[in-house]
Amino acid sequence: MYRAENIRVTAGAKVILDDASLSLSAGKVIAIVGPNGAGKSTLLKVLAGERRYGHGTVTLDGTPLQHWDAAALARKRAVLPQSVVVAFPFFAGEIVALGLPQYFPRSEALRLVERALREVDMLSAREQSYETLSGGERQRIQLARVLVQLWANGGQGYLLLDEPTASLDLPHQIATLRIAREHANAGGGVLAVLHDINLALMAADELVAMRAGRVIAKGAPKEIVTGDLIHALYGVRAEIGAVPSGPFLLPQSIRG
């Protein structure tokens, strides 16, 4: 289990996270939602071990995160950031292969890279220059990279995804969340920062709702999502509809 408890992060006088807590267990998809500047990405980076914090604790499988060495941590969790800068010319397939451990058997490496490219619908771009890909295509290649990272180490572990659908068209948004669900169903855990509240409602077992650095609500979507919560998060009025699979958001008309 991944656990963050009472995390506080500051930058000078600004409080970025204020007593933020969440737990992520195997078999679950958790979505962090909230407005810009709420601290969503910072909390994910704290869990990833990529952001220092001034107060609180982060543990992975009961061990403080700072006690994990980099190689062991890479076998347990893979991180998809909002954007990745690639400074050298690579083919798309080579970017995916960067997720593999050093000295990984070549035949198995080729198999996993091909599998991951198929999973994200990018096999045809394997020999294409990464620089020539669109933003959404690059995002899918990076998703394939983190999938390979976990598959090479047993296939489970935790996916930490920071806005994985932001650059994608609707079919690939849905496909990305299907991949996340399948990873959880196979025994992994997924934490995703999502801006599209309806995608979050569709995909997540649990929502973590954040505003101004604080977690103001968390739980199953059916249990916590109300018009009042949406107003508290975003300052807008919305109706909450329901279908058998769960709630969905209907913003008020913008036509006046």
What does each model-found stretch correspond to?
Residues L110-A125, L147:
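Conserved ABC ATPase "signature" region
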Residues H231-G256:
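ABC ATPase nucleotide-binding domains
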Residues V33-P35:
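The feature captures the beta-strand-to-loop junction immediately N-terminal to the Walker
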Residues Y2, I16-D19:
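Conserved structural motif at the start of ABC-family nucleotide-binding domains
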Residues A48:
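Helix-to-loop junction immediately C-terminal to a conserved catalytic motif
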Residues G56-P64:
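Conserved ABC transporter NBD signature motif
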Residues L159-E163:
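Catalytic Walker B motif of ABC-type/P-loop ATPase nucleotide-binding domains
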